[in-house]
């Protein structure tokens, strides 16, 4: 295991700063549908509100038993490779349905090109958010530190 360089540490710190708009805790579709004004609290203390029509469309796409598993907002992970990644079984299922892609039961990750990302964001602007990933910073997987 090699030590991270100063540049790597700086870049990771900046990416974490850029991601302040992300929620402290994502909520399930089930939780959000019960709220009068569906929202999550972001890391920077602001609130991100969801459009109820988007939530209803997601509820129509996804079988009811998965409403408690779909975590929102769906995070569109942007990383070093230039591709976007969506993670999570329920999240991937929704994205595949929206994009007309084949979905497999065991699938918990999907890579998207930027045209697909644009379509997804146009369909669900409040139910999706960009996340800048540190996982493949500088073209290599992030090293997990154990303390």
Curated annotation (Swiss-Prot):
InterPro entries: UPF0216. Pfam families: DUF61 (PF01886). NCBIfam families: PRK04115.1. This is UPF0216 protein MK1676. Belongs to the UPF0216 family.
